[in-house]
């Protein structure tokens, strides 16, 4: 099989990379009705599989789970989760032939085996759904021409998909129809109904493409979302300890610092995050972020280039074929780092202390978010897609580090994201070491003293922060989500 993206001509590639339209609430007036009365069979019962299924069932859809025979016979975790939640569970042979929509929510590396197993069992004219398009775009999986292929991709972990639904809301979602597989022209109707059934229509839906979703998703998770947080955690911890900071305090400042800092990012973008600093600290954070962007730009561009060309995917799939040797080695090495093995700090760190003593961390967040966004947009990805795959998801990933450090982040994210994270962080750490060595007092671990600032300089920095394209599109999208939530709560 050939990488699907690489079979397209340049015009087709650009058209699919640039496909992104914010859909109006009125386009979901019919809710999930298009799928009501039809049989939806989910393959896989992990975080996305279970939580999407719960939402879809609560939206009135007929949901069951198809699992491998051995998973059922051995009563594995997937079987237990599905049965404990009252779902019908059966083998592929028992459930797939009756399905109107088969939703493949297994890990990326299992997609080819799953699709090759279910395709012969699917009835003529059925639909196949994904929540990530890697199998279609990067693997180049060939799907029978009578089958409609759609995607509904919530921009949050599965647990958040469920919690937001229970609150009467949802999470921002991308939907797409594979242009090679829409024989009856019903793909968009299926995708819209599926998105509505998960609650995504209440938070905002982008009509996208499989290509745009995959390329932007890979870029975001490799760089700012996971790779930058891992590299930043390791570098900042080692710097603090080398300068005499108690390892336990240093660990807590970093572990919970990312979450605290990005909560401001979530509420008001880079502007609010930077506004949490004193004026002297803001100017310093801005200067550091500009230096970081200059240093890291070639690395971000290399990751984007390798994602666009398929070089990243081919390398990762080679590691799949080699029993994940690289992935497992990197995972083990990460677990042995000083940050991961540091003792816990029992004292309290106040919220503002994370900002005051984390100027470098804030600069890293700003630089990473802006670089990821800029690099995606320069590659033809529309700004809204780039926003969701950079700034929007960052607080969610930071929250995983707050739970159990980098271990938790790498457990929660997909193996695809974890592999890309290691590629980036292993390159980024040595790249930034000379920069880290030149830091000044107050950049990390201690506060920058209050003092006079130049008004014109502060004005120009504030203007530069607020006028960045990601702040403009972010303000629009966050405002839309707030409006949608207000409407949803009002009923």
Curated annotation (Swiss-Prot):
Active site: 132
Highest taxon of the lineage: Bacteria
Residues holding Mg(2+) 2: 217, 389, 393
Domain spans labelled KARI N-terminal Rossmann: 15-208
One Gene Ontology MF term: ketol-acid reductoisomerase activity
Keyword Magnesium: yes
Example of a GO biological process term: isoleucine biosynthetic process
Family according to the record: Belongs to the ketol-acid reductoisomerase family.
Function: Involved in the biosynthesis of branched-chain amino acids (BCAA). Catalyzes an alkyl-migration followed by a ketol-acid reduction of (S)-2-acetolactate (S2AL) to yield (R)-2,3-dihydroxy-isovalerate. In the isomerase reaction, S2AL is rearranged via a Mg-dependent methyl migration to produce 3-hydroxy-3-methyl-2-ketobutyrate (HMKB). In the reductase reaction, this 2-ketoacid undergoes a metal-dependent reduction by NADPH to yield (R)-2,3-dihydroxy-isovalerate.
Protein name as it appears in the record: Ketol-acid reductoisomerase (NADP(+))
Organism from which the protein derives: Salmonella agona (strain SL483)
């Amino acid at each position: 099989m050939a990488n699907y993206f690489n079979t397209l001509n340049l015009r087709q590639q650009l058209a699919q990379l640039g496909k992104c339209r914010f859909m109006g609430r009125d386009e979901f007036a019919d809710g999930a009705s298009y799928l009501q009365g039809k049989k939806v069979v989910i393959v896989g019962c992990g975080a996305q599989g279970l939580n999407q299924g719960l939402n879809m069932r609560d939206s009135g859809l007929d949901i069951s789970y198809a699992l491998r025979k051995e998973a059922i016979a051995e009563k594995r975790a997937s079987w237990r989760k599905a049965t404990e939640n009252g779902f019908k569970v059966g083998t592929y042979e028992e459930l797939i032939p009756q399905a109107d929509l088969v939703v493949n929510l297994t890990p990326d590396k299992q997609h080819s085996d799953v699709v090759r197993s279910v395709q012969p069992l699917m009835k003529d004219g059925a639909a196949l759904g994904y929540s990530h398009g890697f199998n279609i775009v990067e693997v180049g999986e060939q799907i029978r021409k009578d089958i409609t292929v759609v995607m509904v991709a919530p921009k949050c972990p599965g647990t958040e998909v469920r919690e937001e639904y229970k609150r009467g809301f949802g999470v921002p979602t991308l939907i797409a129809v594979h242009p090679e597989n829409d024989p009856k022209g019903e793909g968009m109707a299926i995708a819209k109904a599926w998105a509505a059934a998960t609650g995504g229509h209440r938070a905002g839906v982008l009509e996208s493409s499989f290509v745009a979703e995959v390329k932007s998703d890979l870029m975001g998770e490799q760089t700012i979302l996971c790779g930058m947080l891992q590299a930043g955690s390791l570098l900042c911890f080692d710097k603090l300890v080398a300068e005499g900071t108690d390892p336990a305090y240093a660990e807590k400042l970093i572990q919970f610092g990312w979450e605290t800092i990005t909560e401001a990012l979530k509420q008001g973008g880079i502007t609010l995050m930077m506004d949490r600093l004193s004026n002297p600290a803001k100017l310093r954070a801005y200067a550091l972020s500009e230096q970081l962007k200059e240093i890291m730009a070639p690395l971000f561009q290399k990751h984007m280039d390798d994602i666009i060309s398929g070089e990243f995917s081919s390398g990762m799939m080679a590691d799949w074929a080699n029993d994940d040797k690289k992935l497992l080695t990197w995972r083990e090495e990460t677990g042995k780092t000083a940050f991961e093995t540091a003792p816990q700090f029992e004292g309290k760190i106040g919220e503002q202390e994370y900002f005051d003593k984390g100027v470098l961390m804030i600069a890293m967040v700003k630089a990473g978010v802006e670089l990821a966004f800029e690099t995606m947009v320069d590659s033809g990805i529309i700004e809204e897609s780039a926003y969701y795959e950079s700034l929007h998801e960052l607080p969610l990933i930071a929250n995983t580090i707050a739970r159990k450090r980098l271990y938790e982040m790498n457990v929660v994210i997909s193996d695809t994201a974890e592999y890309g994270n290691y590629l980036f962080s292993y390159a980024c750490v040595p790249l930034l070491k000379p920069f880290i060595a030149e830091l000044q007092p107050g950049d990390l671990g201690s506060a920058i003293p209050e003092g006079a600032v130049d008004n014109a300089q502060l004005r120009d920095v504030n203007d530069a922060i607020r006028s960045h394209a990601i702040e403009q599109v972010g303000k629009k999208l966050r405002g839309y989500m707030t409006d949608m939530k207000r409407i949803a709560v009002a009923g």
